[in-house]
Amino acid sequence: MKRYYYELMGEDYNSYEAAIPDGRIKARAIAQAKRAMRDLGIRRALLVVNSMRTSNILDIITVELD
């Protein structure tokens, strides 16, 4: 069962149009966010984790490329 949906955002909280599948495994979403960041040429972004049930923000994860 999918518990979270993800949104990739810049540090100014503007959304990038990156397709990160819904799911329940955050590590997989982070890996997909990094792949999208490489494609978009972004070095640092925020991965927002939202609840499927309430649509509330549960976590904001800073993602950086090495």
Description of each model-found segment:
Residues 1-18:
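Short aromatic-glycine-(Arg/Gly/Cys) micro-motifs in beta-strand/loop hairpins
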